[in-house]
Amino acid sequence: MYRLRSFLASAFLTSIICLAGCGEKETVSEKEQPRGYRELLQAYDAGMVYKSAEHKPACCVITFSDNSKLTIFDSAILIHDCTASAPKEVTVSGDWWQVGERILSIRADSSVSDEDAFPVYCYYDRKTLHMYLSNRQHLVFPSVVSDDDLAEEEELARRQNIPVVRIETAGGAGIYDKTNYVRGTITISDPGKLYSDVEELSAPMGIRGRGNSTWGWPKKPWKVKLDEKAEILGMPADKEWALLANYADRTLLRNVVAMKLSEICGFSWTPKMHSVEVYLNNEYQGVYTLCEHKKVSSSRVAIDKKTDFYFEIEENQDETTVWKTSMGVPMMFSEPEVPTPEQFDYVRQLFNDFEKALYSDDVAAYEDYVDVDSFINYYIVQELTKNVDGNFRKSTFLTKEQGKKLEMYHLWDFDLTLGNCGYFDWRVGNGPQNFFIKDFASNCTPGDNWINLMMRDPAFLIKLKSRWDALMPEFEKIPDFIKEQALYLDQAQKRNFQRWNIRESVDWVMFPSLGSYEKEVDYLIDFYTDRLYWLDGAINDL
């Protein structure tokens, strides 16, 4: 340690050895052993553990695990930074050392002790410090970084290199509405092969706007329709895809979290989705969620178009065929888009009979009309996320297959969930407490809805509590899932919020900005955790 301190006190090291390094072309000649070499060797012999190296003007500072430092001046020993590039191959050609393609005038002599040898080639990589000595020794310092740590770091870097979507429209045309497709080409690159073995896919397509209120926000959501079906990022082949902007969600994760909950609950279909970075006509647009568009197909809403029905509950009622049930639930036909008069009459009567059964003296009469398990799963996710749209008002999707009951088939649209809504009724508030789906009707005022009327049935409550308890262990893993997903977005989110200021807001719609991505993610985790444990008690007290 005395020699180490003596070395640190040295103001300048005068002896020079020119070493071939990463990209260096100098010839190395054997001269007087450089000062500082023995101090570095003593640190190695003492078992000091390498932590990091930092190049500064004319020197390199080596830090060990005990935070002691050793300064190596470049005029003494050249220590090369190979953290971002491979080190040179070091071999012996005859009796002479060879670094890369250059043979050095340093003899390889194994009879010489380490103390009397010369450093031939020194470098540090992402793990530790290496020293090749003229006596054929390769000294590798112990490191605070294990192979497992390095593998995890490499995997994280790979995961953070999220796919890139480049959209080129014909003639650079803009995308101005939700009706007319603009022709162009889409290219999806996945250099890290995160989701498939295909690094790049390029295809002709049309693109238009999508969404309801989200279309009016600065960061635009889009729908893409390929000319031919194609697998994208490991998702089943199809023509139709959605690019969700998540402008209102400053974590960029709430839809991803909701689909994880959908997987846990086992809905008949969970839309697959991946975070991507998007460029439109070479202009960066930010982080989007590329996902399967909701539609009837064998890999999505897998029903028979000839005999079955696919419905959407949506207060905007922007499809061709719409109506309201006797309880005022705003319904739309998604498939068929234009039903026959007989089909329309059948469906309206079906929902009227269902709602009449909800008020029946027979509290279990509703079971003749609905797949109870799917409604329980729907309720659990909507209540857990405290979804302002989830009270049979918006973005709710049901199917009626021939010979089967009404089923809550899949989930959709969760950007204003988990504490991110700025317009909850004052009686429920935006905090993690209080029921919302259970107590509020589709017009967002306290009143009857399909779920709370089912809760009149003791058997329904028993099933609900049992299902909740079964799902709870998986629900408790979600905070770690959020942390993982946020870590994967760590680099991309910075670029997103350079493009879209994180402090921007959509008036009263969104929860106010917290000022940083880290705070937004922490808030999401805290809200979810508090909501989970509040509901755990509240549901079991029903």
Report residues per predicted region:
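Bacterial N-terminal signal peptides that target proteins for export
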Residues: 1-12
